[in-house]
Regions:
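Active-site acidic-Proline motif in GNAT/NAT acetyltransferases
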Residues: 78-80, 84, 112-113
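Short hydrophobic/aromatic beta-strand or adjacent loop that forms the aromatic wall/cage
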Residues: 42, 149-156
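Hydrophobic packing within well-folded, soluble alpha/beta domains
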Residues: 77, 90-94, 106, 121, ...
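Acetyl-CoA-dependent GNAT
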Residues: 3-5, 9-80, 91-93, 97, ...
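Conserved catalytic-core motifs of GNAT/GCN5-like acyltransferases
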Residues: 109-110, 122, 127-147, 154
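Short glycine/proline-centered loop/turn elements that form peptide/ligand docking sites
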Residues: 87, 91, 113-117, 133-140
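Conserved GNAT acetyl-CoA-binding A-motif
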Residues: 98-109
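Conserved acyl-donor/pantetheine-binding loop and adjacent beta-alpha core of acyl/acetyltransferases
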Residues: 56-69, 134-149
Length: 161
């Protein structure tokens, strides 16, 4: 029997499980997002199946790309557990977090090449705003190899009721 899926706000005590279950290499992303959460800039969300992390997302309280809404970003579900409702659960939890702070909507930025993620967001009711932005970043794979990426992001939003 598969353990139930839950999503909650990350805590500092989750760091060892996150590093083991969803390694980020030299980026140390989990620690960085927890620090930004402590500073009030973001809310770091983690999906769990039992005691194993199976996905993450970040609610940035200042939207990018001209959005007046907070933005769900860095949504990641590893390929072996995709198509199991994890991404959807993280999105819905992010919406609840935004609502609990009195926000009227939520934005999601999606790389123009990520057709699968865009289809998910659109199925969930998110609408393309026509706003675009470009961002570059560096990440490290599990072997420590450096990768430079540039994303061309389109902004989708959902008004929260």
């Amino acid at each position: 029997m598969t353990a139930a899926l839950t999503v909650r706000v990350a805590e500092d005590a989750d760091l060892p499980a996150l590093d083991r279950g969803l390694p980020t290499g030299r980026n140390d992303a989990h620690r960085a997002f927890l620090a930004r959460q402590a500073a009030g800039e973001v809310t770091y969300l983690v999906a769990w199946r039992g005691d194993a992390p199976v996905g993450v997302g970040v609610v940035r309280w200042t939207g990018r790309g001209g959005s007046p809404y907070p933005e769900l970003s860095n949504l990641h579900v590893p390929p072996p557990v995709q198509s199991q409702g994890i991404g959807t659960a993280i999105v819905h939890f992010a919406e609840d977090v935004a609502r609990s702070r009195g926000r009227a909507g939520l934005a999601i930025g999606v790389d123009e090449d990520n057709v699968r993620a865009a289809a998910l967001y659109e199925r969930l009711g998110y609408v393309d705003t026509g706003r675009r932005w470009t961002g570059s970043y560096t990440w490290y794979d599990e072997s420590g190899a450096e990768h430079a990426e540039t994303e061309h992001v389109r902004v989708l939003t959902l008004k929260l009721g």
